[in-house]
Amino acid sequence: MCMNRFFTENRKRGFAYRLKQSTFNTQYVDIIVDSKEPRYYLAIECKSLKGKRLSFSSNFHKDKDGVHQIDNISGFISYTGRRGFLAAEFRGGPKNEAYLMPWELVLEYFDSAASIPIEAFRECVVLERITGGYRLPAGLPEE
């Protein structure tokens, strides 16, 4: 996993784990990262998509009560005190591209647009493609 590789390579203390999806349990985000460093105490939602835009209507869902996934994730981030990120992998071009976008920026787009273009992701944290996955080359920006 990208974050665990980062912790190992940079001799930092932290651990990332993917939450299993279940029909009967609520899963707020895909990856939880625990670390004593607040910078790496994270909640990460992952999206893998074809195309050049991430759509809030087709790439996210509403729960049985009609609450949008963005709102549920935002509540989880606020309640737990974690830093939120959206990991987006864009597939189908000459090469796959992946990025981490801070959750605050995701919310800005959610409040003002129907989708987020790939160009906006390219201005965020770039994940380097390596054999078997991705690598976080430089760490995360301070809050």
Give the ranges of each region predicted by the language model.
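Nucleic-acid nuclease catalytic cores
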Residues: 74-106
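Short, solvent-exposed loop/turn segments that connect beta-strands within catalytic domains
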Residues: 36-40, 93-96
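Mg2+/Mn2+-dependent nuclease catalytic core
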Residues: 49-72
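Helix-rich interaction surfaces within compact, conserved domain-sized segments
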Residues: 1-12, 99-143
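Conserved catalytic cores of phosphodiester-cleaving nucleases, focusing on short active-site segments
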Residues: 31-33, 40-52
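Histidine- and/or cysteine-centered catalytic micro-motif in compact active-site loops
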Residues: 21-22, 36, 46-49, 89-91
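Acidic-basic catalytic patches of nuclease active cores, encompassing PD-(D/E)XK
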Residues: 1-24, 36-37
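Beta-rich catalytic cores
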Residues: 27
